[in-house]
């Protein structure tokens, strides 16, 4: 029952948040030229797509596959994270030389510790050990759960073939990773573990002392992150480890928060050459992520697009002797994403109003709506309400109704039909009178 309840809550949260505008509204190129093959940035407070570059382009998922393993774990076992399991020997060969957290077979771990290993070190053994244990050794069954849940979340370009990302058949895209991360962010345990710059793994059967797992997300650590560090970074994961002597592309999926505004950043297939920080371990996707993070938080803020205390429009009023017009006010200030250096006046307002309103009117009555656009994209629709009571003048109302009746189609039809009937009746009477005046012929009979 708890699993079902957790699943329902998670999907309610997800569906309430995923109504997105048609396209991205902003371009970072004046500040930074994105080199990734694809990217997707969304403000989760407003669901506004801030930046979109080939976001549906399918790419290799690599280590990001662990996000789907975590999604299955948290959907079904969120209340059992402190339960223990033994790292199975059966997965040893599969993860050989990729066991980034040194979690050895037959050692005992909690599922929460496995989460820390996955999210700090991208540990393949943690993902495979969790999947093997919870699926009762049926890894294909676990992968089937991953694909089923992925589709329920809304992904369209993702395919999962193992629990950790070693297999090259794991594919995804920037939009899909946004959906998956946003789903995961609905779990408190995920948010807490993702934000840890390090984790102390307790001593185990084959480890006499505890060990410290330092997060590969260098942006989380002020002490060791160097130029990558950003206080706004809340958590994230890379598809591959940092480059040193080799080359390639890298993807990073993360989220940041500053001054109450939250954004998800999905940067896919950044070339290693784009990292110009100069460290021996190059992190190109994280480099581009923090550059885009700087651009977003420096350029935009959540502001009120409308002032509910100011008149936004006027509309003619009929049947009132007190006023000819009615002042309209927005029913909501509509907090939205706007350039930091401007205010709500940068939006374009498109009013949807009747030609006039008729008294009586009560303050607060909804009269119409205003559609707000920014850079050609609709950012919201707000109701417009009456700013004051307007009483009806009975005389004006009566006179207008008489005029309305006298000019109505109904009266015109009645008059025309009456005229036609009168003409027909007149013709009939004329014919009848004519027939009466005509002399009758006498009939003579022979005898």
Regions found by a protein language model. Give the residues of each.
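Membrane-water interface at transmembrane helix exits
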Residues: 15, 74, 131-132, 428, ...
């Amino acid at each position: 029952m708890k699993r079902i309840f957790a699943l329902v809550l998670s999907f309610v949260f997800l569906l309430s948040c995923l109504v997105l505008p048609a396209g991205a509204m902003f371009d970072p190129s004046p500040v930074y030229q994105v080199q990734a093959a694809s990217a997707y940035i969304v403000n989760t407070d407003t669901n506004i797509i801030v930046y979109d570059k080939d976001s549906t382009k399918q790419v290799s998922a690599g280590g990001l596959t662990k996000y789907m393993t975590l999604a299955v774990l948290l959907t079904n076992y969120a209340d059992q994270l402190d339960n223990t399991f033994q790292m199975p020997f059966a997965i040893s060969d599969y993860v050989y030389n990729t066991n980034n957290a040194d979690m050895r077979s037959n050692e005992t771990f909690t599922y929460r510790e496995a989460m820390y290993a996955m999210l700090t070190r991208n540990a393949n053994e943690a993902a495979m050990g969790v999947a093997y244990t919870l699926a009762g050794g049926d890894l294909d069954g676990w992968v089937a759960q991953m694909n089923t849940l992925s589709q329920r979340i809304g992904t369209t370009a993702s395919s999962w073939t193992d629990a950790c990302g070693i297999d090259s058949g794991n594919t995804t895209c920037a939009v899909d990773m946004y959906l998956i991360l946003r789903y995961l962010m609905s779990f408190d345990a995920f948010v807490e573990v993702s934000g840890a710059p390090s984790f102390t793994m307790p001593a185990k059967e084959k480890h006499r002392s505890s060990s410290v797992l330092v997060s590969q997300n260098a942006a989380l650590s002020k002490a060791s992150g160097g130029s990558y560090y950003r206080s706004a970074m809340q958590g994230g994961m890379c598809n591959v480890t940092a480059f040193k002597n080799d080359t390639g592309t890298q993807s990073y999926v993360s989220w940041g928060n500053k001054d109450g505004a939250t954004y998800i950043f999905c940067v896919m297939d950044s070339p290693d050459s784009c990292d110009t920080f100069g460290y021996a371990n190059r992190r190109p996707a994280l480099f581009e992520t923090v550059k885009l993070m700087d651009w977003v938080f420096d350029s935009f803020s959540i502001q009120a697009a409308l002032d509910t205390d100011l008149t936004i429009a006027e509309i003619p009023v009929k049947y009132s002797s007190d006023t000819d017009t009615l002042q309209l006010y927005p029913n909501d200030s509509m907090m939205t994403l706007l350039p930091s250096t401007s205010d709500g006046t940068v939006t374009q307002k498109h009013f949807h109003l009747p030609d006039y309103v008729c008294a009586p009117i009560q303050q607060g009555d909804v009269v119409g709506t205003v559609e707000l656009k920014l850079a050609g994209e609709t950012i919201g629709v707000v109701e417009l309400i009456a700013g004051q009571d307007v009483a009806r003048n009975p005389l004006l109302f009566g006179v207008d109704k008489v005029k309305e009746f006298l000019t109505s189609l109904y009266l015109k039809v009645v008059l025309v039909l009456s005229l036609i009937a009168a003409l027909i009746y007149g013709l009939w009477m004329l014919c009848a009178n004519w027939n009466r005046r005509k002399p009758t012929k006498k009939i003579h009979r022979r005898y």
